[in-house]
């Protein structure tokens, strides 16, 4: 069984969860669920980044103790992830003792390697990034990621990390391991950044009290990124022996705005400490409205709870990942256009195509076979023309779509995985129209043909449920149950041997209810 350690960026505890947080977690969860279907030993970690100046300032503005503040924020995030069916195995928080011990151990190891020294920093600081910035990185005197925030001039004595020493090793690793930074556009961005050389970076702050004490110097706290990045190893037991059982990570899932930290600083820290690098860092794009600029009233319309309530958590997961390619940005011109597309996609793909296919299939099996699913095996040698026998064309299309789905999911092209699954649904609906089971049912000589049609439709629905289960775990389990399936969904290669025998009693509710007009 292959090990697959998967992480997302930990969420900063200075506000409420929003659609951007959800997009990353849902995508990573789909990958985790797919890998479990493949039989991998998956360990999936998410969490909270709870230290730093912004958290301290936010808590103080509310008259709160920072620890009490982050405890409450963590509860909000946990509640949302539970509602969205995020199947994480661990939820790491940077205020936990296990994390702080790991940070201290890592810094001590880097220090023993001679890569920590003290110096005075003079330059610019972006409070939005909580990062020091070179003048060459600014656009019109502002941070390009936080153009509404004022850039601060700062001077303080800090501990520094010799990042500049790792430029050549980083380039060599990236060029030798093409999969290390994905998609390719992000890899090229990082290689371009490295061509200009690297400066050493601060590893501590002397003016921020809310953080992990810097090892050996309580007057300093660990710089927020030096604190946050090691969560990926603290969550799996670093520096204890159990750490080796899960590390290295197979995949770090992050947003495109933090590639510099994850593809330059983090691997350099690991190199210094003699720790193996993660296999892949995947930097996804953003889902945006009008380039990300929203009024307060527009932001309220995109409240995460309200969006999930609109059509339910599974539909939200499905539509978000279907509409937004995992490797690029998706920008909607207005909030209303996003909501309209959400509704249109829900009605077309789920209520109409998938929901109607399930309803038609179940109804015909009840009507024509008294609820018993015909035991007709798929023809493993069927050709794409479907000329050999009724049912062959749909079985062939389903198999081909499942191969396309598997290739897309292996490449983390999640929207293409969804499209492959929906190809089966469209093929199945067309197959019903072409084969006309209602006519076959009236012909006593067409019994075998009708059995083949109904059996192929059930296979197509089960295949669709398996393929869409990483995206809609609840609804796909319900499809399986409505077809008479028992226990968990079959794995992708075990569908034929797990087909149900009988459709259960009719239910009054529909799988994807249409909203009341």
Question: What do these predicted ranges mean?
Answer:
Residues 1-180:
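N-terminal, positively charged nucleic-acid-binding surface of large information/translation enzymes
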Residues 1-3, 43, 47, 119-124, ...:
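Basic, alpha-helical terminal appendages of large translation-related enzymes
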Residues 2-46, 98-102, 152-367, 419-421:
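Structured secondary-structure scaffolds
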Residues 9, 52-59, 86, 328-340, ...:
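A short small-residue
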Residues 51, 300, 397-402, 460:
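N-terminal alpha-helical segment
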Residues 78-81, 107, 111, 355, ...:
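Structural signal for well-ordered, non-membrane alpha-helices
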Residues 325-328, 332, 336-351, 361-380, ...:
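Long, amphipathic alpha-helical stalk/connector segments used for oligomerization, subunit docking
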Residues 351, 355, 395, 399, ...:
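Generic structural concept
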